Amino acid sequence: MAATHKFRNFPCDYLAVDIETTGVEKGLDLIVQIGHCAVVNGLPVDRSGTLLDWTAVPSIDQRWLADRLALVKKRVEFDRQGQPTGKHYHVTYDRLRAEGADPIAVLRAYRDWFVKIRADGLFLVSHNGNQFDAPFLNGAFSVFLGEDHPVLDGELFDTGMVEKALRGNLGLWAEDTPKSFFDRVGRQPLKGVRWALDAFAIPQHGLHVKHALDMSLAHTADYDAYLCHLLFQHYLDESGRRLPGPAAGGAAV
């Protein structure tokens, strides 16, 4: 990519990030799980996901929260004809209440981490992160913490937009920066072009077989972050870019 040099420590050290939400409406929907896969020299060294327990927050309409989560689960697990998709959605109202952490504390921890990542010269990897995860996270930081942390150009590598560009034959322009490229690809409707992480990109590249992946765990934030890492490493391998040390892959961490 033109302006690849803007990614600091590229492509060795980064944090793959994913979120699960109650829907796609920024300013309305809530982040209910944040997951990450931290990578050093191309190898995953830490993977974790945290549920955000909005059930204990008085300002949140609990009936709305339960209904939104039930709707997301239905949309993931059943198609428009009501037939099972074979997919699973793992975030429920009861799980938030039983296993979730204080959402403000979780958001604060991740915002502080992102600030440190910027200072340390790492970058983020996410699937559709340019249009969805990054702005959704920044919106939550702004609303619930009163502090912005917008992702800067060259701080996020969007595997979703790379996959979409590959399938839609969208090339780079000489003046492209990472963000301008991801923005431009994101605006293209490209009817019929598939690039979803679990439903297309991972199986299309045979990564579910190569890494013996349990795809029933997709739509869990930490697992999807790990899938983003594997897809990013696949792009590096395909481009002939090699990392120092042993190749990434193998069993999930």
Stretches with model-predicted labels:
Residues 119-136, 140, 175-253:
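Acidic, Mg2+-coordinating catalytic module of metal-dependent nucleases/exonucleases
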Residues 50-54, 150-167:
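A short, structured active-site edge motif that brings together acidic residues
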Residues 132-155:
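Substrate-recognition/cap helix-loop segment adjacent to the acidic, metal-dependent catalytic center
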Residues 157-184:
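Short alpha-helix plus adjacent loop in nuclease-associated cores
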Residues 91, 146, 202-206:
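Short aromatic/hydrophobic-glycine micro-motifs
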Residues 2-138, 194, 199-201:
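Conserved non-catalytic scaffold segment of RNase H-like nuclease domains
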